Amino acid sequence: MFDFSEKSRRYQHQLNAFMTQHIYPREEEYTAQLHAAESRYGYLPIMHELKAKAQEQGLWNLFIPPSLAEFSDHGGLSNFDYAPLAETMGRVLWSPEVFNCNAPDTGNMEVFMKYGTSAQQAQWLTPLLAGEIRSSYAMTEPQVASSDATNVELSIVADGDQWVLNGRKWFITGALYERTRIFIVMGKSDPHNTNRHKQQTQVLVPKGTPGLQLIRPLTTLGYDDAPIGHAEMVFDNVRVPLDNVLLGAGRGFEIAQGRLGPGRIHHCMRLIGAAQRSLELACKRVTSRTT
């Protein structure tokens, strides 16, 4: 039906084999480790093991598009060619992390590739590409309709050689995860600019920065999505160096548009895979139940 490239077809075959051999047979083990872990948001041993296997087989950072292929030995796939891979990964909700293709890291890595300085890339992109750390993207807020990025209210104010952040964010994916090290935070730095698309700025806030408070975990439809999860956060006079800005003051909306587009496609493809797997499991249950 679709004419995928030879490279995409090769990865599809390899990924399907990996899922069959290493992922599907260990779903119950993953769940058992999650429930037995000391921390609800800790890094599970099975994930460490499976990531090493995926990296050895070259099933790593496959989301990186051709325009950014210089950042990886793998990937180099268009969204069209990557779509069936994302769909396959979505068949097991936690499996994208195995291949370093999990949100929000994929979008955040693209932000660093497209808009980060060489110093920012060395500090944050390199370990993200290696799967050594995780990251979060802090845009959504409780008091505004955050689907329109121009609505964000968190303030970002320059004070000497620092940015000062004050405000609240919530449903921030990965904020509680023990391997998360960096937040990309979007706020309003120039609220009186007549161009509403030039009012926003994005800055980097390392986890553990004074004034950055993780208030509580949040659920979606009753699920906490551990171990990654979602959190409510407060920024109380959080200070970071001016060099932590991405692309420049007033460029935050521009970054958001460049980041969120591909991510929405990836999410949709993964959800198609999850829906297909759910249907398959339901059909299997219907034909195999005895009571």
List PLM regions with ranges.
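A structural signal for short hydrophobic beta-strand segments in well-ordered beta-sheet cores
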Residues: L154-V157
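Glycine-rich phosphate/pyrophosphate-binding beta-alpha loops
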Residues: A145, W170-Y177, P262-H266
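Glycine-rich beta->alpha junctions and the first turn(s) of the following alpha-helix
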Residues: F2-E6, R10, Q213-T291
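Amphipathic, small/basic residue-rich leader segments at the start of a protein or domain
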Residues: M1-C101, A119-P127, R134
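Short Ser/Thr-interspersed hydrophobic loop/turn segments at strand-loop and sheet-helix junctions
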Residues: G58, L85-G90, M186-S189, V205-P210, ...
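A short core secondary-structure module
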Residues: D161-Q162, N166-I215
